[in-house]
Amino acid sequence: MARALVLLSVVLVSLLVNQGRASDNQRLFNNAVIRVQHLHQLAAKMINDFEDSLLPEERRQLSKIFPLSFCNSDYIEAPTGKDETQKSSMLKLLRVSFRLIESWEFPSQTLSGTVSNSLTVGNPNQITEKLADLKMGISVLIQACLDGQPNMDDNDSLPLPFEEFYLTMGDNSLRESFRLLACFKKDMHKVETYLRVANCRRSLDSNCTL
């Protein structure tokens, strides 16, 4: 009888601990979604402010660049389209999101310089800090998803493709400045989508349609 009571106590404690972890992970997921939403909205505002600051001739030049044909993040293997995203596991979506956020830690410093003269985007230097915080949160979610298993994602060891390209951004040309802003917006939209679907994956009864 005593042994049964001890066993029951252990089971109850384990359940409470697991419930606490699940609650913490849910809060972390919600915070991650909110943070990347803010970054996506900030990216959209930066592009609008950038375009508003241009002369008519410069805007005509931009019309020749858009739609955007290439971003350096295209090197990162990621789900494309709604169907592939919805079929991806929560762990895969978290890993891709981590990779995309990580890839912007260095170029976000150039991004800050691109919009440093804007008075409406707040302090652009905070973008790098926001990315670092989001990266840390996603890393914790990945570890929780692995539940003690080793991380076997080969892509984690691949070099990031951004650093050399953005070293050429020193001339701050119109084309490259716009490309940088547009790519940042594109990638933040990706991460927002992936995190939303990954968060939805936590509930088996949820309809995770996009």
From Swiss-Prot:
CDD domains of this UniProt entry?
Answer: somatotropin_like
Question: Record's Gene Ontology CC terms?
Answer: extracellular space
Chief location = secreted
Question: Which cysteines are disulphide-bonded?
Answer: 71-183, 200-208
Question: Has UniProt tagged this entry with the keyword Magnesium?
Answer: no
InterPro entries with a match to the protein in the record: 4_helix_cytokine-like_core, Somatotropin, Somatotropin/Prolactin, Somatotropin_CS
Q: Which GO terms describe its biological process?
A: animal organ development; growth hormone receptor signaling pathway; positive regulation of growth; positive regulation of receptor signaling pathway via JAK-STAT; response to nutrient levels
Localization annotation = Secreted
What does the entry list as the binding residues for Zn(2+)?
38, 192
GO MF assignments? growth hormone activity; growth hormone receptor binding; metal ion binding
Signal peptide residues are 1-22
* Functional summary from the UniProt entry: Growth hormone plays an important role in growth control and is involved in the regulation of several anabolic processes. Implicated as an osmoregulatory substance important for seawater adaptation.
What protein is this chain from? Somatotropin-1
Naturally occurring in which organism (per UniProt)? Carassius auratus
Q: Provide the gene name from the record.
A: gh1
